[in-house]
Curated annotation (Swiss-Prot):
Protein name: CTP synthase
Coiled coil: none
Positions bound to UTP: S13, K186, T187, K188, P189, T190, Q191, K222
Catalytic machinery residues: C381, H515, E517
Catalytic activity: UTP + L-glutamine + ATP + H2O = CTP + L-glutamate + ADP + phosphate + 2 H(+); L-glutamine + H2O = L-glutamate + NH4(+); UTP + NH4(+) + ATP = CTP + ADP + phosphate + 2 H(+)
Pfam families xref list: CTP_synth_N, GATase
E.C. no: 6.3.4.2
Segments for region (Amidoligase domain): 1-265
Length: 543
């Protein structure tokens, strides 16, 4: 029998509900329970695939091709359980499915309403495919009181009423702000947030109180009294030195124990040795490297959330601190002096994915710098494409090389993928098609050349990686690019789609069409990030 933990947020957004859900799931998992985490997103987009990175942050892609919220990345990294399409739902998808059914006549003439049709769809989502689980943690996006979130709150209220009393637990994440002028933590915002939640029919069982100062016992007692919870169920959640220290901190404050107490369960103490190990690696590095990330969305680091974490994983694997220098690609279009000034201090250069023409000449310039100066280079998605364009222009003699994504070109070294094979059959796309849900998404196999650098890094010649792209390096240019020094060391199984390029005449120069950062985990750092940081460590010793 699955038990459900519903996680809501109050007072303000960005309190860390996703990290809290991931940390609690990791603690329950460490006690021997089977867990899965799900995310309810109240926005009306069908998925975040067409949303601006500045609005939404990173789009996290699952093995089965779902474009989801970045919180699912936290879920995977903390639990090691691969997320699926079935773990993320949006209001947009719910309404689309309901309207499709209504047009088809599935409701037999009934009036379609928020209650019961929308709330039933939410409840069905929460309970789907849970037979083999002990705990299902459901995070509700946004803040209690948001208009778009009301159907989700109502659905959870109904679900609590329909399930056995020992099957549900409500955890409310709230803010206890510190007022410096008064020198006090204020509990009133938490009281009002809980009052709003109870007004919607839900009494929280546990309060997780985010605060920047330790929560005094007197304030915990006050919150417990006014919010109608046990004092032991008021859990302080102070800022942590690293997100990977959060599970240890929550365990020390008794969060997982309080959850088990609520459900009337007993379990062995959690084995947290591996969490203690990675926190030790993070807090006590034996060296330091600086990585320059030349991107388009550097004003919002959430746009590169998994990338940032994967670099940290590579650092922990090599016992070094990774300092990330976020560099706006457009600045590199001003000339060589600016490029040299920004990139010379770097021990490694990474060009991540992105869409559109803006900043691409700056990315190409940074690739050239890395190639000529023999600085470790890692290109991901658009970064690989720009590495191929740079190689075409400067080492293969194809002066007008470009991408059709940026406009008409006589030398389309990069072009739109018109068709590719999936498990279901042949997928086809056209230049003028819809943007949403039409990319090459999810996990695909690649075959690696046996004597290549990447095969040595992976320790295998067959790999599976997650993709999210509409454009691809044009295989018709493969022979000319290889004459210029680029080696196509990874291809799709049919040999038509380039997946990896590298330069044998360079200490560490690799471009990949996929997104390896999506599969990196703190306990299993992705081999490419582990290798990239190792190369940066060697570079740091040379300068």
């Amino acid at each position: 029998m699955a038990r459900y933990i519903f996680i809501t947020g109050g007072v303000v957004s960005s309190l860390g509900k996703g990290l809290m859900a991931a940390s609690l799931a990791a603690l329950l998992q460490a006690r021997g329970f089977r867990v899965r985490i799900r995310k309810f997103d109240p926005y009306l987009n069908v998925d975040p695939g067409t949303m601006s990175p500045y609005q939404h942050g990173e789009v996290y892609v699952t093995d089965d091709g779902a474009e989801t919220d970045l919180d699912l990345g936290h879920y995977e990294r903390f639990t090691g359980v691969s997320a699926r399409q079935a773990d993320n739902i949006t209001s947009g998808r719910i309404y689309r499915d309901i309207i499709t059914k209504e047009r088809r006549g599935d409701y037999l003439g009934a009036t379609v309403q928020v209650i019961p049709h929308v709330t039933d769809a939410i409840k069905d989502f929460a309970q789907a495919e849970t037979e083999d689980l002990d705990f299902v943690l459901c995070e509700i996006g946004g803040t209690v009181g948001d208009i778009e979130g009301l159907p989700f709150i109502e659905a959870l209220r109904q679900l609590h009423n329909e399930l056995d009393r020992d099957q549900t637990c409500f955890v409310h994440v709230t803010l206890v702000p510190y007022i410096a002028a008064a020198g006090e933590l204020k509990t009133k915002p938490t009281q009002h947030s809980v009052r709003e939640l109870t007004g919607l029919g839900i009494q929280p069982d546990i309060l997780l109180c985010r605060c920047e100062k330790p929560l005094p016992e007197g304030e915990r007692a006050k919150i417990a009294q006014f919010c109608n919870v046990r004092k032991s169920a008021v859990i302080p959640a102070l800022d942590a030195s690293s997100i990977y220290a959060v599970p240890l901190q929550y365990h020390a404050e008794g969060l997982d124990g309080e959850v088990l107490r609520h459900f009337g369960l007993t379990a062995p103490d959690p084995d947290l040795a591996r969490w203690e190990d990675i926190v030790d690696r993070y807090q006590n590095p034996e060296g330091e490297v600086t990585i320059g990330v030349v991107g388009k969305y550097v004003g919002l680091q959430d746009a590169y959330k998994s990338l940032n974490e994967a670099l940290a994983h590579g650092g922990m694997a090599n016992r070094v601190k990774v300092r990330v220098k976020w560099l706006d690609a457009e600045l590199f279009e001003k000339g060589d002096d600016e490029i040299a000034a920004q990139l010379e201090p770097m021990h490694g250069i990474l060009v991540p994915g992105g869409f559109g023409e803006r900043g691409t000449e700056g990315k190409i310039a940074s690739v050239r710098f890395a190639r000529e100066r023999k600085v470790p280079f890692f290109g991901i998605c658009l970064g690989m494409q720009m590495a191929c364009v740079e190689g075409a222009r400067n080492t293969a003699g194809i002066a007008g090389a470009s991408s059709t994504e940026f406009g008409p070109t006589d030398e389309p070294v990069v072009g739109i993928i018109t068709e590719w094979m999936t498990a279901e059959g042949l997928e086809k796309r056209s230049e003028g098609g819809d943007l949403g849900g039409t990319m090459r998404l999810g996990a695909y196999e690649a075959h690696l050349a046996g004597n290549s650098h990447v095969a040595n890094i992976y320790g295998s010649t067959v790999i599976s990686e997650r993709h999210r792209h509409r454009y691809e390096v044009n295989v018709a240019y493969k022979e000319r690019l290889e004459k210029g020094g680029l080696v196509f060391s990874g291809m799709s199984p049919d040999g038509l789609l380039p997946e990896i390029v590298e330069r044998p005449d360079h200490p560490w120069f690799i471009g990949v069409q996929f997104h390896p950062e999506l599969k990196s985990r703190p306990f299993e750092p992705h081999p490419l990030f582990k290798g990239f940081i190792a190369a940066a460590v060697k570079q740091a010793r040379l300068v």
